Amino acid sequence: MIARIHHVGVVVQDLDAGLEFWRDTLELPLLRSADLPDQGVRAALLACGTGEVEVLAPTTPDSGVARFLASRGEGVHHVCFESDDVVREVRRFIGTGVDMIDGKPRQGLAGKVAFVHPRACAKLLVELATPSGRAPLPETPLALVAVHGKVEDVGAAAQRLQDLFGMNRGFAAEDGSFVQLSLTGLMLQLTPLGGGFPKPGFTALRLRAGDLSALARRLGERGIPCQENAVGLVVPPGPGAGAPLIVEAGR
């Protein structure tokens, strides 16, 4: 059974720079990190509210993460759904004709993991994971709220994610320009291609900060630009961040 969105994967050029941003500047607790030579990456998982952020950097030029970085630059790489039995989930998907990158689960930083092929998910990269343990997450100054994505057909993509992962449909624009999906409080917000994004993929993260002014001060002290808008702060992609961030105030 798929229970929740476990984490969002963000690709950066250098993991140390990524940790400097996510751990040191945003003050997210580091849960664990590891070199994964069989996957050609270094990775770190950080707590972020009820979810987690996985920061990935390539260690070999032929890894999937390296290819992503070469073609798209730093950015949001994947969304991971937690299952209580990823082996069963993979068998179910294969049995119903869903294309998988991993025909069998393998060990990853989040536990036993398997990636669904993007062609089965509206060209979005999705991971399944069964964590090896389920310790309570520490309190964090920021919480992951939503992942923004661009797709070719918003309605079809939303239906596919509902069918595969049991996501709940929320607000949807009548003209098909926006659909909001959720699972245990975390949201995916889908819009059509455009606005500088010619290919389907995840484009930005929305976070919530308990103290928005303190975050703005920390960003300023480290020379990281941010802009205020009606929602809160917008942090453009920069070294280590890996993705545009939209940060709103609230608990």
Each language-model region and where it sits:
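Vicinal oxygen chelate
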Residues: 90-143, 179-189, 213-251
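An N-terminus-focused feature that recognizes amino-terminal "leader" regions
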Residues: 1-9, 15-47, 52-58
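Intrinsically disordered, low-complexity segments enriched in Gly and acidic/Ser/Thr residues
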Residues: 172-206, 210-216
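A structural feature that tracks compact, well-ordered secondary-structure segments
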Residues: 54-58, 80-84, 92, 98, ...
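Amphipathic alpha-helical segments
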Residues: 16-29, 89-96, 153-169
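A mid-sequence, solvent-exposed acidic-amphipathic segment
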Residues: 140-190
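Conserved catalytic-core motifs of GNAT/GCN5-like acyltransferases
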Residues: 29-36, 105, 169-173
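N-terminal beta-strand motif that seeds the catalytic metal site of vicinal oxygen chelate
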Residues: 1-19, 74-83, 129-158, 202-205
